[in-house]
Amino acid sequence: MSASVAVVSGFLRIPSIQKSQNPSFLFSRPKKSLVRPISASSSELPENVRNFWKWLRDQGVVSGKSVAEPAVVPEGLGLVARRDIGRNEVVLEIPKRLWINPETVTASKIGPLCGGLKPWVSVALFLIREKYEEESSWRVYLDMLPQSTDSTVFWSEEELAELKGTQLLSTTLGVKEYVENEFLKLEQEILLPNKDLFSSRITLDDFIWAFGILKSRAFSRLRGQNLVLIPLADLINHNPAIKTEDYAYEIKGAGLFSRDLLFSLKSPVYVKAGEQVYIQYDLNKSNAELALDYGFVESNPKRNSYTLTIEIPESDPFFGDKLDIAESNKMGETGYFDIVDGQTLPAGMLQYLRLVALGGPDAFLLESIFNNTIWGHLELPVSRTNEELICRVVRDACKSALSGFDTTIEEDEKLLDKGKLEPRLEMALKIRIGEKRVLQQIDQIFKDRELELDILEYYQERRLKDLGLVGEQGDIIFWETK
């Protein structure tokens, strides 16, 4: 699902994003604007949105007392307060019968075919089938869904070319390849043998559309629900000014004597009547992940990150010993480390680098006698040779990655400052700038470390001090027998 570039010593790779890609909230492209929202009560609202609001009213989900309603906003569609909304006040509640999740698929006509499918694949297939069914009970909701988002999975080849050199590009291509492989499997196992159940020929483009919808709009991390579309709730947009994602939504019982479940969405902040209601999608996602999942990026430098992949080569003569040590410290054959703009190196990264680089005279630390202490020893420099190697490998990896870009940070910033850019080009520029800044930061960290190699204290010196064999000036103490 990802591509990587091997560099230098063979134990460090510059990969695509390796974090889990769980579907979470929904698509939006936040922009600050003073444009007046067009609300659901207005005749200016698109007909499909008015029909959607009426459908929700007919379902008993909304009424004249509802505190928020759909509206045309700078991001596209959003939820706007009909009256003042207090902090942590419930904005909407959607009953389970209006959710779309794997259970919905199981109860549908195609349910018997989907038992062996991945949950997201089965829901994607359900969405596509219902989209082509004119009499679908979900018709009004499906008519509300966009044909695409600004997620990089929908970008053209020309647009993707603007991401040349970035990890986001390799991740996007890897994700698209993964989705295509899942579609080909689905086509052979389900679609072709069961043409009678599908009124229209389902294509790869349909499948990518459904994937993008789920990636951008589905809620996850809920009680018993890891993949669920919630009509109306999925109009809520993201605001970077909101710094908490706690308690914005939950699944709860409908009442004391009811077995029904409700999806409850709360406003994390006070909202005035007529203003848009926002939440925080995910505080931990990088800009590359935001671009892939939702189709937007933030200006916050803490969203800029780069993933270094470090692996123990199978050709290493000490492969087994190193793997045992890594696994005993909750790591593995490959380590993924996210370096964030302006922040220190992640915990465990230097230790893992030193472990992977261990060899020659330093290999004695791999002996079983050190099993319980080696990770602690690796917190500090082992030897000049070991430390010099990891500095060289990381710096060469950064230079290799930077050479993959056609432009400098200054050139990208000049383009960005001109303004009036297409949203996707603007996003690509910000991603390029962010990744290059972090690469330069990593390179500088290890460049500074190279300058300290002569003054660092290494394992042997620390050991001699522990034994009382080194004086205050660093000279070795000898005793002569009398």
Swiss-Prot record:
Question: Which residues bind substrate per the record?
Answer: 217, 221, 234, 249, 281, 294
This enzyme catalyses:
[fructose-bisphosphate aldolase]-L-lysine + 3 S-adenosyl-L-methionine = [fructose-bisphosphate aldolase]-N(6),N(6),N(6)-trimethyl-L-lysine + 3 S-adenosyl-L-homocysteine + 3 H(+)
Which GO molecular function annotations are given, in alphabetical order? [ribulose-bisphosphate carboxylase]-lysine N-methyltransferase activity; protein-lysine N-methyltransferase activity
Q: What is its EC number?
A: 2.1.1.259
A GO biological-process term = peptidyl-lysine trimethylation
Positions contributing to S-adenosyl-L-methionine binding = 75-77, 217, 237-238
Principal location: plastid
Q: What class of enzyme is it?
A: transferase
Q: Where is the SET domain?
A: 59-282
Compartments annotated for it: namely:
Plastid, Chloroplast stroma
Where are the bilayer-spanning segments? none
- Explain what the UniProt record notes about the effect of disrupting the gene for this protein: No visible phenotype.
Q: Where is the transit peptide?
A: 1-57
- The source's domain of life comes to Eukaryota
Question: Which keywords belong to this entry?
Answer: Chloroplast, Methyltransferase, Plastid, S-adenosyl-L-methionine, Transferase, Transit peptide
Any Gene Ontology CC annotation: chloroplast stroma
Q: Which PROSITE patterns match?
A: SAM_MT127 (PS51583), SET (PS50280)
InterPro entries assigned: Rubisco_LSMT_MeTrfase_plant, Rubisco_LSMT_subst-bd, Rubisco_LSMT_subst-bd_sf, SET_dom, SET_dom_sf, SET_RBCMT, SETD3_SETD6_MTase
Member of which family? Belongs to the class V-like SAM-binding methyltransferase superfamily. Plant protein-lysine LSMT methyltransferase family.
Q: What does this protein do?
A: Protein-lysine methyltransferase methylating chloroplastic fructose 1,6-bisphosphate aldolases. Can also use with low efficiency gamma-tocopherol methyltransferase as substrate, but not a cytosolic aldolase. Able to interact with unmethylated Rubisco, but unlike in pea, the complex is catalytically unproductive.
Protein's recorded name: [Fructose-bisphosphate aldolase]-lysine N-methyltransferase, chloroplastic
Please give the organism. Arabidopsis thaliana (Mouse-ear cress)
